[in-house]
Amino acid sequence: MSPLSSLPPKTFISSFHCHSVTRLRRSVTARTMSSQSSQRVFQLRQDPLTGNSEWIVIEDNDQPGTSTDGLLATTSYLDMLNDSRRNIAYRLAIEKTITEPCHVLDIGAGTGLLSMMAVRAMRGDSKGMVTACESYLPMVKLMRKVMHKNGMTKNINLINKRSDELKVGSEDIASRADVLVSEILDSELLGEGLIPSLQHAHDMLLVDNPKTVPYRATTYCQLVESTFLCNLQDLRNNEAKTSDGVRLVPPGLESLFGIKSQQYSMHVDAIEKEIKLLSEPVKIFEFDFWKRPESNGELDVHIEAKTTGSVHAIISWWVLQLDSEGTIFYSTAPRWIDSNSEIGVRDWCDHWKQCVWFTPGTGVSISKGEKVHLHASHTCTNILYNLKKTQSLTHERTHFPLSTGDLHLTLPPERVAIYGDSIYRQSLFEATRKALQGKSYPQCLVIDDSLLLPLMALHISNRSRVLSLSPGLQENAARYFEAIADSNGFSKDRFEYFRDGKTNLAKAYPGKIDLLIGEPYYSGLENGLPWQNLRFWKDRTLLDSVLSEDAVVMPYKGVLRGCAMYLPDLWKSRCCLGSVEGFDHTLVNTTLGGCGDLPSGKDSPCLPFFIWQCGETKILSKEFTVMEFDFSKPITGPCSGEVQIEFIKPGVCHGIALWMDWVMDEENSTVISTGPDDKYWKQGVKLLGKPVTVRMEGPSSSIGIQASLDLSSNSELIVTHTIS
């Protein structure tokens, strides 16, 4: 694991500044306590239905109740180990690099695949040794089992520490290592702490001029035009086209609101038809693993446009050279690049994607043959861009001067696009207007992190008063609404951010709330499963006492919907493992959440994905309703539902896509769907244990879906299926 990492390994979350980031689906914090006999980790886990956090205990030994299955089942380890192209490249490079007994260091060892490859390359010679460090205790426990299964326990010294905690000459590592093997890479390349890890290793853990696998990484970028990508950040211009009269980004206050200036991982192959290439690929940075890297770097390059257009985004990727001779490569480039290269096109995988850097506003207009100036820089964890038409050089990142102190409210790109979508806004506006009808002096309570609904309620009724809980955005939301009040034509005394919690709210406003509303949207749950936004119902239940007799709750109900899908790429990336480059990995399947040949009684979890980014996909059935949740009433107990799938197309069914439809009013006149037809929402995916062949004629398998959800205890949706 990289030295700066305080999080478990292999996450899917975006990069943060100042520390390394790993690849779990949700960010967690872990604290370690150890003794001579065992080790114990306290890991912070958040309940998405309440926002509350609790410490859970992970024991070094496998005592009942301390299973790590749930902690690793949502990680990308399985996807990575199913990436055969990556596995083969590492095997070939390790066999080519390690030709005699030596001391090998594996940083961020995971299941131990690279360590075992190194042992095999030394042919089990007792003069050779492998030191493997892995900081996350659940993964350490799993690696021990894999090592034992493959007879490698005596050949690998596994240490449950970060690499920067190792000291040469101690019981951890007797001497400096001759060879470094590692895979501390994310989609951006640097986000898992590659640079600080290499710096510490070269300073403290490796011999001079060591051998390394990989040998070098090179980043590339390409200028593109894409209306879809532009919509993910340009709220100001999209909002100007709407007719609701509400302005999230009023003129002159653009600095208040936007996305973070960072790289965003994305499968750009899925939108290839929506992308216009404006330049040839450009080489940006080289990082040599075999020597100590610098913490920061800069590059200025002039890029010639090969066609006329507007630069809406910069797409980036990297290429690994795994051996020193330059014969073994691995690339994360888009298919339109690799299809024309010697490296070739890799199979779809989710653990490494391309990255997108957004150009602010409407982009940079360029003409064919014109050159634009790109300033690229990197920190220890990020690669940054600044694109200009002028030839004047600047080493500053693009930003708007803040006009209201340091306030800058940041939202994910998909949320920015949703707020700029005229259809979504019109639906929300009409639903809010309808909910306010007949109420003279309405007291409105917005219980989620919506930015649109408070403004719409204030705009539609000039006698309304709005309370907002903003549980995720908190004080920043309050400051934001205060800053845009004048531009939206309401006095600040009509809006209140209630900061004293739901319990005190119930005491302060008993029976006084006429309208309880939400989109629902909770900051921090964007990468979660769709039904986790049923936190709205949980909060509504807790606040039942504040509602007046004729209070309106919006949305009126939530509907869990689904459809059967052909998902060959996703299923292949999450299927159970057998032999990985000659090493038995069958025992990791349950722990890592595999689908396929799991033991009886075990099942793979529901995972959140943008369906449109999941490689080849096809909808095979009619959409169906699994469960309905009536928000007009408090939660009274567990919910359940079952449905028989009605197929409309032949094919192979790999899984079920699940999402929420929000019915905004009792008459069902306004329904906001988060299904796979829209690219701005993630869906939940439940992969089948075995793919099912569907025929339209003759005998064919039938699939029944059963689901249950107990919101009084947790947000885990239990989905099972029967095949007949």
Swiss-Prot record:
EC supergroup of this enzyme: transferase
Pfam families reported for this sequence: PRMT_C (PF22528)
Any GO MF annotation of the entry: protein-arginine N-methyltransferase activity
Enzyme active site: E183, E192
EC number: 2.1.1.-
Family annotation (PROSITE patterns): SAM_MT_PRMT
Keywords, comma-separated and alphabetical: Methyltransferase, Repeat, S-adenosyl-L-methionine, Transferase
Gene Ontology terms describing biological process: methylation
Ranges where the SAM-dependent MTase PRMT-type domain occurs: 61-388, 395-721
SUPFAM superfamilies membership: S-adenosyl-L-methionine-dependent methyltransferases (SSF53335)
Biological function: Arginine methyltransferase that can both catalyze the formation of omega-N monomethylarginine (MMA) and symmetrical dimethylarginine (sDMA).
Similarity remark: Belongs to the class I-like SAM-binding methyltransferase superfamily. Protein arginine N-methyltransferase family. PRMT7 subfamily.
Protein name: Protein arginine N-methyltransferase 1.6
Gene behind the chain: PRMT16
